[in-house]
């Protein structure tokens, strides 16, 4: 059976740390920021580490060979 390919969209959206955790950008930042709190805007900057079950799903389904 051939090797499963890494999804191109996942390559652009996720990074795997040295310890195997998955980093991604925070959601909800595209538009409508005027009604968000300053704390939400501040916390949404940069990247965040996904929860362990979500990270496992991303690696299994979208990044089978890592990055």
UniProtKB/Swiss-Prot annotation:
Keyword Ribosomal protein applies: yes
A GO term, aspect molecular function: structural constituent of ribosome
Entry's Gene Ontology cellular component terms: cytosolic large ribosomal subunit
Protein name: Large ribosomal subunit protein bL35
Classification of source organism: Bacteria, Pseudomonadati, Pseudomonadota, Alphaproteobacteria, Hyphomicrobiales
PANTHER family attached to this UniProt entry: 54S RIBOSOMAL PROTEIN BL35M, LARGE RIBOSOMAL SUBUNIT PROTEIN BL35M
Record GO biological process: translation
UniProt family annotation: Belongs to the bacterial ribosomal protein bL35 family.
Species of provenance: Rhizobium leguminosarum bv. trifolii (strain WSM2304)
